[in-house]
Amino acid sequence: MPRRGTIERRIPPPDPRYNSVLVQQFINKVMQRGKKSIAEKIVYQAFDLAAERLKKPAMEIFETAIRNAGPVIEVKPRRVGGATYQVPVEVKSDRRQSLAMRWLLMSARARSGKPMYERLAAELIDAYNNTGATIKRKEDVQRMAEANRAFSHYGRF
């Protein structure tokens, strides 16, 4: 246990366009090699494209996509008497959002062809509609947790 107490989480300032911390965190995840202006351009273009295609506000699409893509339960390895069990645990809201953003981005990058903003917009639309690679990933994680429900008693110490 640390003796110095806990460190407060740094929350980035909200982004200028949507005034949302969540969007700023997403921009930071999209950013590569410190090129934030390019990441902002990609995210904003993707939001505009998704809003245009679905005829709904961009923030509503993004928040719903994040909510749909985040897992409720996941497995964590726990070593008990020489054997490692995959123990299902509930996912905290911060981690749920972080995983959802990470998976959305990974799925968008895995798509081929087209510019990044189009791939990201397509992935956001898929997550909004509860389809696509991101949702499949979430369902796989939750299925794994469900399969290992027998070991859930190891999660409580």
UniProtKB/Swiss-Prot annotation:
Keywords: Ribonucleoprotein, Ribosomal protein, RNA-binding, rRNA-binding, tRNA-binding
CDD domains: uS7_Bacteria
GO biological-process terms attached to the record: translation
SUPFAM superfamilies on file: Ribosomal protein S7
Gene Ontology MF, one: structural constituent of ribosome
Keyword presence, Ribonucleoprotein: yes
Family annotation (Pfam families): Ribosomal_S7
Keyword rRNA-binding appears in the UniProt entry: yes
GO cellular component: small ribosomal subunit
Record-linked InterPro entries: Ribosomal_uS7, Ribosomal_uS7_bac/org-type, Ribosomal_uS7_CS, Ribosomal_uS7_dom, Ribosomal_uS7_dom_sf
Description of how the protein assembles with itself and partners: Part of the 30S ribosomal subunit. Contacts proteins S9 and S11.
Family listed: Belongs to the universal ribosomal protein uS7 family.
Function field: One of the primary rRNA binding proteins, it binds directly to 16S rRNA where it nucleates assembly of the head domain of the 30S subunit. Is located at the subunit interface close to the decoding center, probably blocks exit of the E-site tRNA.
NCBIfam families: rpsG_bact
Protein name: Small ribosomal subunit protein uS7
Source organism of this protein record: Roseiflexus castenholzii (strain DSM 13941 / HLO8)
